């Protein structure tokens, strides 16, 4: 069988650690579940998914890996799609679970693609750069708290499960990875979500500035004063100091009273 060759421009670091693969699948109930795996790679994790899940659909962008995967998993409950997940039309109706070992350079884009299609998923387990995992689960008043923290925690209850060292991959990445679980919230509304994402992105446009100096780029002084008076904010408050609930209220206030 042809040996898979990692491609640097695709950010490929193939998982090779059996204990890590087992740990990932043990953190979620896969029985009778239909799974989407983004990036099969060598099919190492796919093997463990197929042992437990009802069906696995894999999006793999690297066409050189397709014949290897097809031969390895012949007659298995697996569908392999040679396509960039970012360009894929997600036409299924039944909710699915996503499991993926994501290239570091494209993590945020894939996350926001998933978020935009939140009604199609119930859970996500992602292997990401440890630094990104810290941003996803970050709390207010911490250095890693960001619009990604807010977006992730708006969509789901998020939990950093465990850290994975470079030795678990081929080739070895230069930094640690981490596995993060997203358990999607119920009763999410697409319009409210889009408004929240748009508003929080504006608030974190210039992270070192005060909230006021971020808002001034799209609001006038009277509108900002209306917000500050209603929420009783201190003049020097910064975007990192406000929690998720406050941002939800802020976005609602903006779209209902100012926009």
Curated annotation (Swiss-Prot):
A single GO molecular function term of this UniProt record: RNA binding
Pfam families: RrnaAD (PF00398)
SMART domains the UniProt entry points to: rADc (SM00650)
Keyword S-adenosyl-L-methionine: yes
Enzyme class at the top of the EC tree: transferase
Main location: cytoplasm
Protein location: Cytoplasm
Binding site for S-adenosyl-L-methionine: 13, 15, 39, 60, 84, 101
Reactions the enzyme catalyzes: adenosine(1518)/adenosine(1519) in 16S rRNA + 4 S-adenosyl-L-methionine = N(6)-dimethyladenosine(1518)/N(6)-dimethyladenosine(1519) in 16S rRNA + 4 S-adenosyl-L-homocysteine + 4 H(+)
EC numbers, comma separated: 2.1.1.182
CC terms in the record's Gene Ontology section: cytosol
Keywords: Cytoplasm, Methyltransferase, RNA-binding, rRNA processing, S-adenosyl-L-methionine, Transferase
Record has Repeat as a keyword: no
Known function: Specifically dimethylates two adjacent adenosines (A1518 and A1519) in the loop of a conserved hairpin near the 3'-end of 16S rRNA in the 30S particle. May play a critical role in biogenesis of 30S subunits.
Record-stated family: Belongs to the class I-like SAM-binding methyltransferase superfamily. rRNA adenine N(6)-methyltransferase family. RsmA subfamily.
Full protein name: Ribosomal RNA small subunit methyltransferase A
Organism: Mesomycoplasma hyopneumoniae (strain 7448)
Lineage: Bacteria, Bacillati, Mycoplasmatota, Mycoplasmoidales, Metamycoplasmataceae
Recorded name of the encoding gene: rsmA
């Amino acid at each position: 069988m042809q040996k898979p060759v990692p491609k640097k421009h695709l950010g490929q670091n193939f998982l090779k650690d059996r204990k890590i693969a087992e740990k990932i699948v043990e953190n979620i109930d896969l029985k009778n579940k239909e799974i989407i795996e983004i990036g099969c790679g060598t099919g190492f994790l796919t093997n463990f998914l197929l042992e437990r899940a009802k069906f696995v659909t894999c999006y793999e962008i690297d066409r050189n890996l397709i014949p290897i995967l097809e031969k390895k998993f012949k007659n298995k409950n697996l569908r392999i799609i040679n396509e960039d997940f970012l360009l894929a039309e997600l036409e299924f109706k039944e909710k699915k679970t996503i499991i993926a070992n994501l290239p570091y350079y494209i993590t945020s884009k894939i996350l926001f693609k998933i978020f935009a299609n939140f009604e199609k998923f119930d859970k996500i387990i992602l292997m990401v750069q440890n630094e990104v995992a810290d941003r996803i689960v970050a709390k207010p008043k911490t250095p890693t708290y960001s619009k990604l923290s807010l977006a992730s925690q708006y969509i789901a209850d998020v939990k950093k499960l465990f850290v994975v060292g470079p030795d678990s991959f081929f080739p070895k990445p230069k930094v640690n990875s981490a596995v993060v679980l997203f358990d999607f919230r119920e009763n999410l509304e697409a319009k409210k979500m889009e408004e929240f994402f748009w508003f929080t992105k504006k608030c974190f446009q210039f992270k070192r500035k005060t909230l006021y100096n971020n808002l001034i780029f799209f609001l006038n002084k009277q509108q900002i004063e209306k917000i500050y008076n209603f929420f009783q904010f201190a003049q020097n408050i910064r975007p990192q100091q406000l929690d998720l609930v406050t941002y939800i209220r802020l976005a609602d206030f903006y779209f209902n009273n100012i926009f």
